[in-house]
Amino acid sequence: MAFEDLLDDPVVQKYLHELVGPKGMPVAAAPPDGEVTDEELAERLGLELNDVRRALFILYENDLATYRRVRDEDSGWLTYLWTFQYENVPGNLREEMDRLLEALVDRREYELENEFYLCEVCSIRFEFGEAMDLGFECPECGSAVEAMENTDLVDAMDDRIERLRSELAVEA
């Protein structure tokens, strides 16, 4: 996938937005060619320097940017020259999907192995042991808690797990 096409993909845009947030999105969405300083980016994008630096470090922590330090011989100050590494985005998304699949499988197992009770007034859910300790009464409002059917939730998880496994080409 070409670099420009990658940034046009709504999934990639959402991923970057989740990483850097709304203040960092201009930094993530408009990476320059070659090296650039944080000051240059802040000036070009009209952003606060701290917001640019925060976004750059988040991108760095996620292997989407690298930097090299150059010391000014006159002042002794360090300048950081940043390069964007968006070719790592597909791999990062794959890792996120793998983590999501693992979490869903674990959660599905938890849902199947436990019996739940619900306070319909407060919408608080309790495991059987906790409900029993509470005398099957909600500690918030005193209403009786009722056995909760979670088949729809498990079915939705099954569907999502199946779709993720299909997208990732992973077998059960």
Swiss-Prot record:
DNA-binding keyword on record: yes
Listed InterPro entries: TF_E_archaea, TFE, TFIIE/TFIIEa_HTH, TFIIE_asu, TFIIEa/SarR/Rpc3_HTH_dom, WH-like_DNA-bd_sf, WH_DNA-bd_sf
Covalent S-S links between cysteines: none
GO biological process terms held by the UniProt record: regulation of DNA-templated transcription; transcription initiation at RNA polymerase II promoter
Keyword vocabulary terms for this entry: DNA-binding, Transcription, Transcription regulation
Gene Ontology MF terms in the entry: DNA binding
Domain spans labelled HTH TFE/IIEalpha-type: 8-90
Keyword Transcription regulation in record: yes
Family the entry assigns: Belongs to the TFE family.
Matching HAMAP family: TFE_arch (MF_01909)
Subunit: Monomer. Interaction with RNA polymerase subunits RpoF and RpoE is necessary for Tfe stimulatory transcription activity. Able to interact with Tbp and RNA polymerase in the absence of DNA promoter. Interacts both with the preinitiation and elongation complexes.
Free-text comment on this protein's domains from its UniProt entry: The winged helix domain is involved in binding to DNA in the preinitiation complex.
Function: Transcription factor that plays a role in the activation of archaeal genes transcribed by RNA polymerase. Facilitates transcription initiation by enhancing TATA-box recognition by TATA-box-binding protein (Tbp), and transcription factor B (Tfb) and RNA polymerase recruitment. Not absolutely required for transcription in vitro, but particularly important in cases where Tbp or Tfb function is not optimal. It dynamically alters the nucleic acid-binding properties of RNA polymerases by stabilizing the initiation complex and destabilizing elongation complexes.
Protein name per UniProt: Transcription factor E
